[in-house]
Amino acid sequence: MSKRDYYEVLGVGRDTSEREIKKAYKRLAMKFHPDRNPGDKEAEANFKEVKEAYEILTDSDKKAAYDQFGHAGVDPNRGGGGYGGSADFGDVFGDVFGDIFGGGRRGGQRQAARGSDLRYNLELSLEEAVRGLTKELRIPTLAACDSCDGSGAKKGSSPTTCGTCHGQGQVQMRQGFFAVQQACPTCHGRGKIIKDPCNKCHGEGRVEKSKTLSVKIPAGVDTGDRIRLSGEGEAGEYGAPPGDLYVQVSVREHAIFQRDGNNLYCEVPISFSKAALGGEIEVPTLDGKVNLKIPAETQTGRMFRMRGKGVKSVRSHAVGDLLCKVVMETPVNLNERQKELLREFEDTLTGQSKKHSPKAEGFFDGVKKFFQDLNS
């Protein structure tokens, strides 16, 4: 049976923040937890599915692989066995869900949250994508407050341990048969109290800021490629590690070339006389114009391959080709003399269709036979 989409399992969108993913997970895990649904196999299966989705979507590497390749990107067996993790009901809440059913990190203080990952959509021209370049990107983000060094407390003071939860960030409450832990209402789950908050960040430890990064874009990138910059995401809470920045590449349509992998395609118009008599034509490439030899009697639609004139692979040393499709252009805006010459030329072909236009002759012979058979 095929697996459901992880985002669908948690009921979130692909651009949902990690914080919202955690909220969705917490709500669904409470709903399907075996302690609340004893003997219910369907609830147990749903619980495992929810946990699996959460563990993938809150791991930046696994999430990136899943976003790009789907379930195959996070399947350790690549086609067999499915998800490699286990749904251990004893430790499932140790990460983010330690406040439910009395689980969680016993005896340890709440850990400050890692910074959120950021995404930057970068649009490139085909030439930029093929050759590579260095781009200056201006990124709006949350940065550690330089006034309090990310502590949230005014310089010269320090956060103090919360007296309500004793630094745990959680308090225990009884709900029927269950001992439920919830975020401490005094410190809002932080485990610390900032009595004298920093004037710049107002006790948050982070401030909104824009930073400029110089990002090297490798030659050969294409739409859908993603570049990861470790540690360039939002600053973590109160000194926790920062998130990562993902640069999502898209390539604009080109006026001449179409790209398919490492190959480039283009259409080149040629005159009737050039197609019939042959000769050389100029063909555009990303490196400049080159001459292409057209054999006599070339038919419209013929494809010519120019090896090594495509795109160098971003993952290897292979270079694609340029494939040129010649399209014969019917002359327009003819003067009387030109029309007369064409009529004379047409007269010279009378009765010689099989010799000069074998495809057309074969086609019309087939049409004639079709109507004869139809009327017989």
UniProtKB/Swiss-Prot annotation:
Its Gene Ontology molecular function terms? ATP binding; heat shock protein binding; unfolded protein binding; zinc ion binding
Q: Which residues form the J domain?
A: 5-70
Binding locations of Zn(2+) 1: 145, 148, 198, 201
- Binding-site list for Zn(2+) 2: 162, 165, 184, 187
Q: Which Pfam families match?
A: DnaJ (PF00226), DnaJ_C (PF01556), DnaJ_CXXCXGXG (PF00684)
Per the record, the zinc finger regions (CR-type) lie at: 132-210
The GO biological-process annotations, alphabetized, read as: chaperone cofactor-dependent protein refolding; DNA replication; protein refolding; response to heat
- Which stretches are CXXCXGXG motif repeats? 145-152, 162-169, 184-191, 198-205
Which cofactors is this protein said to need? Zn(2+)
Q: Where does it mainly reside?
A: cytoplasm
Please give the coiled-coil regions recorded for this protein.
none
Which superkingdom heads the taxonomic lineage of this protein's source?
Bacteria
Q: Which GO terms of the cellular component aspect does the record hold?
A: cytoplasm
**Where does this polypeptide localize?**
Cytoplasm
**Cofactor: how bound:** Binds 2 Zn(2+) ions per monomer.
What keyword terms does UniProt attach to this protein?
Answer: Chaperone, Cytoplasm, DNA replication, Metal-binding, Repeat, Stress response, Zinc, Zinc-finger
Q: Which HAMAP family match?
A: DnaJ (MF_01152)
Free-text note on domains in this protein's UniProt record: The J domain is necessary and sufficient to stimulate DnaK ATPase activity. Zinc center 1 plays an important role in the autonomous, DnaK-independent chaperone activity of DnaJ. Zinc center 2 is essential for interaction with DnaK and for DnaJ activity.
Tell me which family the UniProt entry assigns to this protein: Belongs to the DnaJ family.
Describe the protein's quaternary organization and the partners it interacts with: Homodimer.
Describe the task this protein carries out: Participates actively in the response to hyperosmotic and heat shock by preventing the aggregation of stress-denatured proteins and by disaggregating proteins, also in an autonomous, DnaK-independent fashion. Unfolded proteins bind initially to DnaJ; upon interaction with the DnaJ-bound protein, DnaK hydrolyzes its bound ATP, resulting in the formation of a stable complex. GrpE releases ADP from DnaK; ATP binding to DnaK triggers the release of the substrate protein, thus completing the reaction cycle.
What the entry lists under NCBIfam families is as follows: DnaJ_bact (TIGR02349), PRK10767.1 (NF008035)
Name under which the protein is recorded? Chaperone protein DnaJ
Task: Give me the gene this protein comes from.
Answer: dnaJ
